[in-house]
Amino acid sequence: MANLDVIVDRSDPAVQRIVDVTKHSRSVVRTVLIEDIEPLTQSIRAGVEFTEVYGLDTVPFPGDLLAACEKRGIRVRLLSAAVANQVFKTEKKPKVFGIAKVPPAGRFADLESLSGDVVLLDGVKIVGNIGAIVRTRSALGAAGIVLVDSGLGTIADRRLIRASRGYVFSLPIVLATRDEALAFFRDGGMRPVVFEADGKLSIGELDGIDERLVLVFGSEKTGPSGEFAGVATESVSIPMNPAAESLNVSVSAGIALHRRARRNLSRPRG
């Protein structure tokens, strides 16, 4: 294990960078704090540009993460216990974390260049659900995700990074208005299908559709908006126990993506 430099002085410029990035009142987000081993590792693999990665001098720095940083030329240092206590006064101290530049937002053009299905989440605001869908998409091969009325101002939201385990940077995620999304899918040559409790197609029939689909999901309470239901060529339902009120949206998306995995995983990613 390499001997890592330890930051012991509160006046080190890195300390102020860390303090600045943890402020909740920032109006313009250009940098983000990414914490924990898996989100850091996935972000590094996705090509996110890091200023520096840090650990605590009281905890061994993970060897695999150090190797990933060295491969990318990312500097790694440790915080002394005293400095860490000053920086994270009101927050739980992460054992490993990094300061990264926020990547550019995803664009509809990024989706056009890919071949897999697209997931559209309409009015889904629970970040944990969005993060779970991002992880499932990474495993099952859809091209990307469009978020409409999600309440998120950036894909670099720390809650989303944590919930997605860092996979949020591994695929195009487009933050769009409803009108922007409708215009793209009208002109983009993809077939929108909306998921509803009384959908006409069963989930099993998705496996036989050899076209690029837009899989449209709404919130559990209200479902997709009428605008998206109006442009969808088909509606799909997932059979379940009549005594159950609904499925969690991340579970529904996972079931749908599993049904589409044969097609999506067989297509080139680029």
From Swiss-Prot:
Molecular function terms, GO-annotated: 23S rRNA (adenosine(1067)-2'-O)-methyltransferase activity; RNA binding
Record-linked InterPro entries: Alpha/beta_knot_MTases, Ribosomal_eL30-like_sf, rRNA_Methyltransferase, SpoU_MeTrfase, Thiostrepton-R_Mease_TSNR_N, tRNA_m1G_MTases_N
Reaction(s) the record says it catalyses: adenosine(1067) in 23S rRNA + S-adenosyl-L-methionine = 2'-O-methyladenosine(1067) in 23S rRNA + S-adenosyl-L-homocysteine + H(+)
Uppermost EC category: transferase
Annotated function: Specifically methylates the adenosine-1067 in 23S ribosomal RNA. Confers resistance to antibiotic thiostrepton.
Organism: Streptomyces laurentii
Residues annotated to bind S-adenosyl-L-methionine: R135, R165, G218, I238, L247
Protein name from the UniProt record: 23S rRNA (adenosine(1067)-2'-O)-methyltransferase
PANTHER family associated with the record: RRNA METHYLTRANSFERASE 3 (PTHR43191), RRNA METHYLTRANSFERASE 3, MITOCHONDRIAL (PTHR43191:SF2)
GO process terms (BP): response to antibiotic
A Pfam family that the UniProt record links to this protein: SpoU_methylase
